[in-house]
Amino acid sequence: GVFFTARYFVPFLRTGKPGRAASAPGKFAVISSQMGSSTRSGTSAPIYRASKAAATNLARSLALELAPDGIAVGAYHPGWVQTDMGGAEAAITVEESAEGLLQRFAALGPATSGVFETYQGEEMPF
């Protein structure tokens, strides 16, 4: 998913789009999970963990590749969210997660490109 999305959209970020100059900085966000972090080992959901580790590391690689083009790439953990997957016991609401992620996207730039952050802006280890 992340790879094919990037493969499709990166050319548009590099060349600009109607109404945006090609020199305007582009941004690309990857939603991952702390369960893909190397510090969160465990035996549950190994395929999910592997897919999130891959997504996070792809974001880091894209950040390095796209930096010369002025495109920032961020990887984000949305939190443990009250969804069908997270359940009613999860720590935060969808709205809280979305609000935090929108703040992270707005702040995404060269200084935070290639960084894995929580929806609250805390840096996470890969």
Question: Where on the chain are the PLM-derived regions?
Answer:
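Active-site micro-motifs of SAM-dependent methyltransferase domains
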Residues: 11, 36-37, 80-83, 87
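Ser/Thr-centric signal marking residues that sit
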Residues: 5, 51, 83, 113
